[in-house]
Amino acid sequence: MNQYDAVIRGINCLPEGLYQRVRNFAVQKNRHWLVEQCDLYHMLSEKYDKLEEGDFQSTLSIQKGLYDYEYFNICFLNNMLSLIVKAVSAHKLPRIEFVDGKGQNIWEQFFEQPYENIHIPDKAVEISDGDQVIGFPGFEEIDQDDRIRLWGNLYRRYVRFNDQTRQYIEQETKDIIKEDRRILGVLCRGTDYTAKKPKGHPVQPELSDILDKAEEKMKELHCQYIYLATEVGDVDRAFRERFPDKILINKREYYDDKFKSGDLTWIKDVHFERENDDYLKGLEYLSSLYILSKCNGIVAGNCGGSQASVFMNYNEYEERYIFDLGLYQ
C-alpha cells in the first residue's frame, strides 16, 4: 500500500477500547485519511456482521456523495461503501437515500439497505456530508491482494442484492456458469472511455492486445469458453471471429452504434427505446460484473467494472491479468 501501512495495521492490533481512543484522537486532529484507512482495516472484524440496535447511537441519512450521480455506476457504489464505513465506524446506522433526477433511490433499485433489519426510531436522524470522504479504492488496488481483501470484505457484507436483482442475476449466472465449463472472463471497455481518455484514469489496452492475451490465458487455464463483458458490438464481433463458438454473453444492449451515430460525448447519454432504460442498463451492467467475478480467471483493462469484479471475486481467481499501461495524461 504505502509507508503508512505498518502504522495502520499496528493501530488495528490494539485492544478495542484503546483503538477507539486512538481513533478519536486522530479525528480531533483532522487526520481524516488515517482514520478512514484504519476504519477500512477495522471492518475486517466479524463483529460488523452481527451489529444490533444498541451498537448505534443515531441514524445517518446518506443523501449525497462526491458527485451528483444520475445513474448506477461503480463510482457511486464505491462512494456509498466509503460512506457506510464512515457511518458505522462512528456508531451511526447508515441509510442510503440518494435519489436521481427522477426521484428514484439509486441504491435501493439494486441493493438492500445495510443492516436492513435494524431500526432505531427513537434516536436522532442526521444528514451526511457526503462530500467529506477519502476512502475510495485507488486504481492500483486492483492488483494488491491485501486491498482486494479489504474492499472485497465490504462488497460481501454490504453489496447485498434485493430480491428482484438477485433473481435476475442468479438466472443469468446459471445460464453462463456451469460445473462442466472452464471460463475465462474478459472485460473490454470502449465508447466514451477510449474516446475521451479521461485524465488520471488507467489507459485501456488495444483490442488486438486483449485478444492475444485472452488466447494466451485460455490455453494456460485450459478454458473452453470466454465470458465477454463489453458495451461495444465491434468488440463482440472481433472476439467471435477470433474464438468461434467459444463466446458467452448475457442479455445486454451494445452502445457503440448509438454512441457514434448520435454525436454523443458520454456513455450515460446513450438511451435505448424501452421502459425503465436507466434501471435496465444498471441491472445488465451489474449482472455482467457479477458473472465476470465467477469465472476461473480474468483478463481486463483497469477500470471501475474490472475493479468491482475483482473485489467481488475476493482473491479467488486462478489467474488475474489486469493490463497496467499507466494513466491518461
What does each of the following model-derived ranges do?
Residues 8, 12, 16-58, 99-223:
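Secretory-pathway luminal glycosyltransferase catalytic domains
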Residues 57-64, 76, 83-127, 297, ...:
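PAPS-dependent sulfotransferase catalytic core
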Residues 68-78:
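A short, glycine/small-residue-rich beta-strand->loop->alpha-helix junction that serves as a flexible
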Residues 72, 81, 283-328:
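A donor-sugar binding/catalytic signature common to diverse glycosyltransferases
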Residues 76, 96-99, 187-188, 228-232, ...:
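Short His-Asn-centered micro-motif
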Residues 102-107, 194, 232-238, 329:
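Short, charged/polar "capping" segments at the starts of alpha-helices
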Residues 187-193, 221-276:
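Catalytic donor nucleotide-activated moiety binding site of glycosyltransferases and closely related
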Residues 203-206, 274-279:
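Short, flexible loop segments at the rims of nucleotide/cofactor-binding pockets, characterized by
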